[in-house]
Amino acid sequence: MHKRAIYPGTFDPVTNGHADLIERAANLFEHVIIGIAANPSKQPRFTLAERVELLKTVTAHLDNVEVVGFSGLLVDFAKDQNASVLVRGLRAVSDFEYEFQLANMNRRLSPDLESVFLTPAEENSFISSTLVKEVALHGGDVSQFVHIEVANALTKKAK
């Protein structure tokens, strides 16, 4: 069965937790589209173009992964990409309530779009983009939480 999946997010920045889920999704689905949301309401540290480039670097070794920036409704983006599955990560129980509401809203807007939830590897379960940015902002070493190119980009942004 040919399944195209979308792993959506802001990815500001992409972390090792995200990379772990991307690799596992790439093993589960024939084609995975990393949908990077423009999401100006979040005031991202990195521009959409920068986030796309960082994700392309992190996923360069995965032949069935494509990185695309988008704006607008996720369900519309999924339809444009001919995707039938949304991949979402759940780090903790606290993520579940929001993700459950989001999955139900997406199902209401697009009944054929299925949500699949993956949990991160234990060593990545506490990592969030927000925490990584906070550590980097205060001069901390984030290289154990993100790809080296992402760590370098964060260091440049912090200066």
From Swiss-Prot:
A Pfam family in this protein? CTP_transf_like
- What do the Gene Ontology cellular component annotations say? cytoplasm
| UniProt keyword terms in alphabetical order | ATP-binding, Coenzyme A biosynthesis, Cytoplasm, Magnesium, Nucleotide-binding, Nucleotidyltransferase, Transferase
Kindly indicate whether the keyword Cytoplasm belongs to this entry: yes
The protein, known as: Phosphopantetheine adenylyltransferase
Please name the GO terms that the record assigns under molecular function.
ATP binding; pantetheine-phosphate adenylyltransferase activity
Question: Where does the record place the site Transition state stabilizer?
Answer: H18
On the tree of life, the source organism's domain of life is: Bacteria
Residues the record lists as binding ATP? T10, F11, H18, G89, L90, R91, E99, N124, S125, F126, I127, S128, S129, T130
Cofactor(s), by name: Mg(2+)
- Give binding positions for substrate: T10, K42, L74, R88
Look up keyword Isomerase and say if it applies. Answer: no
The organism named in the record is Shewanella pealeana (strain ATCC 700345 / ANG-SQ1)
Q: What is its EC number?
A: 2.7.7.3
What's a GO biological-process term for it? coenzyme A biosynthetic process
EC top class, in one word?
transferase
Output the InterPro entries linked to this UniProt entry.
Cyt_trans-like, PPAT, Rossmann-like_a/b/a_fold
Compartment(s) where it occurs, according to its Swiss-Prot or TrEMBL record: Cytoplasm
- Give the catalytic activity: (R)-4'-phosphopantetheine + ATP + H(+) = 3'-dephospho-CoA + diphosphate
- What Gene3D superfamilies does the entry give? HUPs
